């Protein structure tokens, strides 16, 4: 529940390229699986949590699982007995770290658009990027502050360590909310994004408490103008 357990390789060979008996030929899906494997074969499995969940443990008859370089991937050596394995997935929260002087708090919605599994870590930090070009994107701009928005996918290995991968480009956007520190009710605010040298003024709404809301599918440098 809340994830998938599947066998993907045996002795390095993809199971989709192998032939099995009708008795045991399902390497795994959402409903489970049943596969015939020889003793001493090296079995590669995936224990994939849904978004918002992490692998908190794995039940596999006492066999040791070895995390691999690829996310959510483990190996074990087949013992001389039947093995039953499953992932134990626990609901967990995304992580948000805000240290930027201009931003007092941050949040996001639709995180599954950025990470198909595990959780996200959003880091909001000050940037020393020049604001001149960003100011030129906004009519009647007076000042701007640069912040870096960094997004990482975090997937637990089940042993207290994680796979961590940066997320910079999304197919579908997430909704960002940044609360402006020392919000000036008399001023207007816009958000300009700089990604790979391209500047884009984003459609931004401003709430009464100074929270800027906008959608984005790229994570790099942002300017609060």
Name these PLM-found stretches.
Residues 74-77, 149, 161-165, 210-217:
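Generic recognition of long tandem-repeat/solenoid scaffolds
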Residues 3-10, 90-188, 195, 225:
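Feature for mature exported/ectodomain regions
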């Amino acid at each position: 529940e809340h994830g998938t357990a599947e066998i993907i390789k045996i002795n390095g060979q993809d199971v989709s390229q192998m032939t099995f008996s009708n008795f045991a030929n399902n390497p795994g899906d959402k409903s489970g699986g049943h596969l015939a494997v020889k003793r001493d074969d090296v079995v590669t499995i995936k224990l994939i949590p849904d978004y918002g969940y992490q692998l908190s443990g794995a039940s596999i008859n006492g066999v040791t699982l070895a995390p691999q370089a690829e996310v959510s991937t483990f190996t074990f050596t087949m013992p001389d007995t039947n093995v039953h394995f499953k992932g134990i997935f626990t609901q967990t929260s995304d992580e948000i770290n805000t240290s930027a002087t201009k931003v007092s708090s941050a949040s996001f919605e639709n995180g599954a658009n950025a990470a198909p599994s595990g959780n996200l870590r959003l880091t909001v930090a000050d940037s020393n990027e020049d604001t001149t070009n960003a100011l030129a994107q906004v009519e009647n701009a007076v000042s701007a502050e640069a912040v870096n928005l960094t997004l990482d996918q975090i997937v637990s290995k089940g042993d207290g360590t994680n796979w961590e991968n940066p997320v910079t480009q999304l197919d579908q956007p997430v909704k960002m909310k940044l609360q402006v520190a020392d919000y000036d009710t008399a001023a207007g605010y816009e958000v300009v994004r700089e990604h790979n040298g391209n500047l884009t003024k984003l459609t931004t709404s401003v709430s009464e408490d100074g929270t800027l809301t906008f959608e984005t599918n790229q994570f790099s440098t942002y300017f609060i103008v």
